[in-house]
Amino acid sequence: MPLIRGMRMAPDTKIAWSELKPYSDLVNTDDIEPRQYQISIIKSIEGGASELIVLPTGLGKTVIAVFAIAMALYKGRRAIMLAPTKPLSVQHYESAIRMLKLNPDDILLLTGTTKAGKRSEMASKARVIIGTPQTVSNDLRSGRIDMGDFGIVVLDECHHAVGRYAYTYIADECKFKGVQLVGLTASPGSDRKKVVELIEALGATRIEARSSFDADVAPYIKGNDTQTIYVENSRIVKSITATLKSIINQRLRKLYEVGLSPTPEFERVPKKRLLMIGDHIKRLNSSNYKFAAIFNYVYVLDLMHAYDLISTEGLYPFVNYIESLRTREKRSKVVDSILKNPQLEAAVSAANSALDSGEEHPKMDALLQFLKTELNGKSAMVFAQYRSTIRSIVKRLIDNGVRAQGFVGKKEGIKQSEQEGVISRFRNGEFNVLVAT
């Protein structure tokens, strides 16, 4: 059973980084405020046990990671620090260059963009390797890196160490070679089972956990000022959602009549329960019966997505989604049936007419008004669930004089270098509203 430890002490005004000597001699701490919880956690790493560290976002996990690396360096060992994405790895690399009292050439940023032939030579010379788990796991498998050469491995966002993710393989290598592993995360799991799985995957025998309620952490938690703005859907949106609800319930009733749905009304079926219907259908034996069930089930899922889009995101995302169904190269019989539904055709026509007259979801007006009132030269981030909504928001803001930019992931074909460029321009003030998923 791992040793679980959490501090409840009040902050000590006399704390200093010198408490961590001799390791603090390897870290530039002049511009870093010492915090009791960080010092306590760092001291816990000194014992050499593999450890899970849980700390809320924004409370200095990077400082802890750098000191963990410094411990290995002091003992004459090398260190690895990994992060799930290249941009995050780059941030850690820049932090290590800035904070560790090492020649920058001793710190290597190792990502997939580095050619495999060069990686082996570069990795053999580096005292600290910072990179992505996919690249390092590939190099471990190919023999370009030997885990036994390292004294410590730090995994940022270690909650990814589940299933077949590269973190899991790296953690297994640490266990096999007896290398200390330190996992950092703000979210170890939503239930006990997931937390236990993470602990086992990391091989952690010690847990250092802090929450925003701990006395030594609370003073550093920034308060949130949450304001909820309620808007009422327009007449046209209410009309279309009513139409979609009617179509969905027609199909859901067919599933209800054969015992696959607990109710014929989709608003009374939790989404999680609805998704479970698919598992029940897979276990059906009769092929004809099964085909009809699958047809109605997929019909419901496709139109529920359309319902979610128009009710929460607006007319444009709804129309855009229906158009994406229409332009698919290989349309299923379900999609053909949906598109030929006269009720849906009328709903799409009404939505297009409303868009032509300049109507959109009332949230757009509320968002624009809020930003124009609150910005005053400041920056803001706007989050939306769907990429089509991001495009709508950005266009609306730009059309009204707000300097906005969308930020989407690689599924949209955006390269990491382009993502980094957007973030850099946001930091430099080239635009002051970032709209992202």
Q: Where are the language model's segments positioned?
A:
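Motif I (Walker A/P-loop) of helicase-class P-loop NTPases
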Residues: 61-70, 165-169, 367
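Conserved helicase ATPase core of P-loop NTP-dependent helicases/translocases
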Residues: 114-122, 379-383, 389-396, 402-437
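Helicase motor interdomain insertion/brace
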Residues: 10, 166, 170, 207-218, ...
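Conserved helix-turn-beta segment of the N-terminal RecA-like "Helicase ATP-binding" lobe
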Residues: 88-111, 199-203
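SF2 helicase catalytic motif II
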Residues: 133-194
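Walker A/P-loop
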Residues: 48-68
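Conserved pre-motif I regulatory segment
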Residues: 10-54
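Conserved Walker A/P-loop ATP-binding site and its immediately adjacent core
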Residues: 62-64, 77-98, 188-194, 385-390
